From Swiss-Prot:
Record text about domains: The ricin B-type lectin domain binds glycan structures.
UniProt superkingdom: Eukaryota
Function, in words: Lectin which binds carbohydrates in vitro. Interacts through its lectin domain with glycan structures containing specific motifs.
Protein name per the record: Ricin B-like lectin R40G3
Keyword Zinc (UniProt): no
Gene3D superfamilies linked: 2.80.10.50
S-S pairs: none
Provenance organism: Oryza sativa subsp. japonica (Rice)
Domain Ricin B-type lectin: from-to ranges: 54-200
Signal peptide: none
UniProt key word Cytoplasm: no
Induction: Induced by abscisic acid (ABA) and salt stress in shoots.
Organ and tissue specificity: Expressed in shoots and lamina.
Length: 204
């Protein structure tokens, strides 16, 4: 039985097969509507990310909730496209040079409202964190990858340097009452839950 109280049929590290392997800068002009221009001030760099579409991040457990930055944490909240804290930039600047062990490209998720990036947690069951983002510096601790499709276009979002720890809407599975306003995003091994299957979808 794991931390969630689920039994062995949820698979531990073997959800996709063997050993947990997934089977499965500069000035920029004003951004047009639907695009985001984020001033990144982390580490005093004061750089600006080029205008680019923002994305919504949500899990299959309840697509009516979206990932948001709240009080320095990353949680789920009722989806509201007018809430800039629910808008994220999927920064792919390192995607051609950094990939995970399965060859999937790395990206950072930067919050439009705060300019902070999602950083790896301290380990399994710990929440992910928000940190100042410097787009000029390659920081592996803020880089993530997506897995192959794990059903209906949803994918795992996992650490670039440890694909066995995935985004997990904590206790957002049906056995714990589902997603709620304020559900924490933690990292967890693959347990085949809908609260571990994510979409990163552009706002239109």
């Amino acid at each position: 039985m794991d931390f969630y109280g689920r039994r062995e049929q949820y698979g531990g590290y073997g959800g996709y097969g063997g050993g947990g392997a997934l089977a499965t800068p500069g000035y920029a002009p004003a951004a047009p509507y639907g695009m985001s221009q984020v001033n990144i001030e982390g580490n005093g760099c004061g750089r600006t990310l080029p205008p680019q579409p923002t994305v919504k991040v949500y899990c299959r457990a309840n697509p009516n909730y979206a990932m948001t930055a709240r009080n320095g944490a990353v949680v789920l909240a009722p989806a509201n496209p007018k809430d800039e804290y629910q808008h994220w930039i999927k920064d792919m600047r390192w995607s051609t040079s950094i990939k995970d062990e399965e060859g999937y490209p790395a990206f950072a998720l930067v919050n439009k409202a705060t300019g902070q990036a999602i950083k790896h947690s301290l380990g399994q069951s710990h929440p992910v964190r928000l940190v100042p983002y410097n787009p000029e510096v390659m920081d592996e601790s803020v880089l993530w990858t997506e897995s192959r499709d794990v059903g209906n276009g949803f994918r795992c979002i996992r650490m670039v340097n440890n694909i066995y720890l995935n985004f997990d809407a904590f206790h957002g599975d049906k056995y714990h009452g589902g997603v709620r306003d304020g559900t924490d995003i933690v990292l967890w091994k693959w347990c085949e839950g809908d609260n571990q299957r994510w979409k990163i979808q552009p706002y239109y």
